[in-house]
Each structure stands twice: as structure tokens, then as C-alpha cells.
Amino acid sequence: MKASSYLIPTAKEDPQDAVVASHKLMMRAGLIRKSAAGLYSYLPLGLRVLRKIEGIVRKEMDKAGGLEFQLPILTPSEIWKESGRWDKMGKEMFRLKDRHDNESCLGPTHEESFCVLVKPMVRSYKDLPINVYQIHTKFRDEIRPRFGVIRSREFTMKDAYSFHLDDESLDKTYQTMRKTYRRIFAGMGLTTIPVQADSGNMGGSASEEFMVVSPIGEETLTICPSCHYSGNIEKTPVIVNRNATKQVFDGKGKLHTPAKKSITEVAEFLNTKEENLLKAVAVVADGQYILVFLEGDRELNENKLKNHLGCNELRPMGPAEMEKLGLVPGFIGPGFPKSESLKIYIDALLDWNFSYIAGGNEIDHHIAGVQLTSIFKEEEVTKIDISQAKVGDPCPSCGTGLTAEKGIEVGHIFKLGQKYSKAFDITVLNDKGKATTTTMGCYGIGVNRCMATVIEQCNDEKGIFWPVSIAPFTVCLVSIAKNPDDIAKIETIYKSLVESGIEVLWDDRDLGPGFKFKDSELIGFPIRITLGKGFLEKNEITILDRKSMAEDTLVYTTNEELVTHLKLKISQLEETIEKEVSLAGT
């Protein structure tokens, strides 16, 4: 491809609304353009990268036995109501009505659609297992689209769904997909960590997210440096360490704490640690009033509580609701009014024999020396793990102190179980002729997000340096010749590269060499060959490795010699990727 007949709309300055490297560089390198909030158009260079990522996903999915489909983006409300998710999906779902007043949505995911499609096609255990997938457009009305294509309202997803006779078969496919995902991400140059995760609205018995460690990540990962346990902080169990010693607050009875409502303010005022305070959090779950008690240095893990309750909505209790129940905001403690309408949950981390500082049930007052046994009978309350894990907590596997990292989620796999199979009555006859409900798995990859995440990992002050497997072009040929005879000579080299199968972009634009160099470094072609004065005088070319910015020179005698040299260099880059893929699949 010649740059003079291609579209390369690069820019020197970062877009004003871009805050992360991938968003800035995708815009500056001419890969995408913003159409509206959370909506992006892919330009030719960007689309080449996207298609290569899709190709890696497709190749590995097919190798793992996946069967590719393409379903409608527009899905009828009936199937969502049948699964019970029409209301659960909330405002993130784009909903619309046609001219006949029929409700539909733009699919944010396709469990329901695939269930309806597959159901009449699987009748016997001999038809299972089956793993179906598509690489298609999805829509989610994100409340705050951000970071360019990392969190957008329209995106490309690879979503796969497997159907099985039993859990043993599901587990086998789940493990196959786990390895397949590691290979997929390694194939595009990403280093991922699989972490235990919350299943959310998807439901099911287990799930794992594939995370890329990054300071811009929206998720927090808990990682054990000893046994390599890893989990999303929303899912990580908090292990009780009764051997840890606490510094007991020296005092008992009523304390005046003027204008001190937050845990931090009270702890500082009383010169004690936050863990010595008893925190009360008042929430409403699907209309049910709930009061949660935690140690003062802990945060409520809303996902854990929602999963325990099985609720759709969890929100803070409002001032009027608290007043109605006789609760004093910021000062809830012993003697608060108990009622049938208020359920109590106690975090499992709380020590029933420890003397805490609790709210005094009146403004500007707390009480020291409070034990849980003085407030509750254990049979009156529910004790569960509902606090957020934090750095230093014991690893749930080996007890070593946990560390934390920020991460970007690029993939998610689920054991869905029979949630959707039962909703849609997907049954097959087993080997004894008895009707058996199938069990399911679900496996998703955010294709656009992968592209941006690669850039987050592969950039420097000059721009992007693409892994060879997904680069828009493998080689950028930069020439400075203007003499027709010299240009004709370069043309023969260009044709030799193209005919050999090398993906090459010849920057033949009528621009200065400095401009061309900056563009090639910004866009991030893995290899750049420069045909300058040395080429015109003695067939000498300069070869640049974009990632390391290392240069070497080659004096060649024939075009075939040049092609052979470049192919060797490209194969070395490819072998590095292939080695990572091979290791990831073990």
C-alpha cells in the first residue's frame, strides 16, 4: 500500500477530552475518530488492527471447537422477560419500540438469543457439547463513557456460549476456554492474569476475569505474592485473623464527639484506630430496609451483599427513611429501635468479644466499650462476609498478606449452570432416554478494549509500538528520493516486498523525512526501512526496530537479499509472540 493513496490523518496534539494514552494515541495516529460520547468510527489503519485482533480470536476459537454464528443485534423484549433480565438490566440497556409498538433492545449480550436459537437444534445427549460464538456489535448505555474505546456505548465483542449434558462436561469446556483465552491474549501481545470474579447479572456458579495490570484500570485486583492467588476485590473473601492484636481504646461509656460524624473524624478526635469503631451502614435492597455492621476501617462490599440477598437494586437509605425507623445518621449504636421491617447483617470479621466504640444514638455522641453481645443476640442477626478486602489481608488460599493492583478487564468466562437452560426449558434426552436440563457456560472478550489495552502496554513518548501480530502494517518503507530513476528503483523494492507477502506501507508522500519518521513512530509499525542517501549511492538501507528504537544498516546486492533479511527479522518478532502463545496454552 502506498501512503499517497491511503488515509493517514495524524495529529501533533492530544485531543482535549482524552486522558489516557490509548485514547490520545488512537486519535493522534489516525486510528479512530469520535462520533459522539462513547461512539467511535474506525479509520482504515485502526480497522486493520481491529480485524487482526478478530482474526486471532476467530482462529483460536475455531481451534477450540467453537462454531461461528451471527445473530441479530436487535432482540425482542419477550426473550429477556422470559429470562427475567428485562428489568434487571436497568438503564444500561438501549430499549426501543417499532411502528407496531413491539418492544426490543439493542443486545448488550446474547444469552437469551442463543438459547432460543439452539434449543430446537439440540434434542439428544449426542448433540452435546456444543460451543457457539459470534464476533459482533454490542450496545450498552454507559452512564459515563470514558477512556475512549475502553468504555464505550457501542463495541465489538466475541461472545460464546456452550451447552452441556452435565457439570463435568461444562468444566472440561470451561478449562479449554480458559487456556484458549490465555492463548488469544498472548497472541495479541497482552499479558493477562485470570482472577476470581463476581458473576453479576450473568448469574452462575463461578466466573473468572482476564485482567491486564494497568494504572488506568477500573478494577482492583488482589494478588498473593506467595501462592499466586488472584481475585477481583469485589469477590475476594476476607479471612478473619483472630491472632492479630488490637489496641483497645482506653475508656468506656458515653463520649461527646462534637460535629464528628465520619469514622475518620471520630477516630482522629479520640486518638484511636478506625478498626476500633463499629460502623453502621443503612441501605435499602429492593425495598427491604437493612442495617449492616462492620469494623470501622472496612468498606461494605455491595456485590457480596447483593449476591447474598439476590436483589436487583441496592441503594443508601435516605434521611426520611432513617428518621422513620428511628435511626440517627452517623450515630447508630446500642439501643437503636429494632423492628420487623429492619434486617440486621453482621460482617463475619467483627469480633463479638471486642470492646468497640459505637454510635450513641444521639447527635454528637458515641459510646465506648460496646460489645456486640450487648446489642444483639447472635440468633437475631445474619453473620456473613460482606466487607471489602484490602492490602495486607490474609490470602484466602495460603494466609500470606495480599497485595493489590489496578487492572483492565479484557475477557470474562462464566459457568452459568442451569439459570438460562431452565428459563428457556432447554432439555435433551440422556443415554437412558430421560429428559435432562442442559447446563451452560459463557465466554466474552471485548475486542475494541483489547486494542486499546495493547496500546496502554505498548507505548512510549514517540507513540505506539505494535506487536507484529496485530500491527496495521508490518513494515513502513520511508523514501526521500525525488528523482524519477531513483523512485523507479524504490518501486521495484516495494513490489518485491509485496510479492513476498510482507505487509508494507510505502510512505511515498511529498513530505520531509522528519515528518515521515514521526508518523511511522506515532503509528507504531514494528519495522521501518529507510531508503536515504546511502541507498542511492551504495544500496545501503537503515532498518529500525520500533519497540527498541535500535537501528542497523544493510548493504544488499539484490532485492531478494533484502526480502530474505526482512523476513528473518519479521520471523524473529513472530517467534517471540508464538513462544508466549505456546506458554500460555499450557
From Swiss-Prot:
EC category name: ligase
Protein name: Proline--tRNA ligase
Key word Aminoacyl-tRNA synthetase present: yes
A GO BP annotation: prolyl-tRNA aminoacylation
Family: Belongs to the class-II aminoacyl-tRNA synthetase family. ProS type 1 subfamily.
Catalytic activity: tRNA(Pro) + L-proline + ATP = L-prolyl-tRNA(Pro) + AMP + diphosphate
The organism's place on the tree of life at top rank: Bacteria
Primary location: cytoplasm
Subcellular location: Cytoplasm
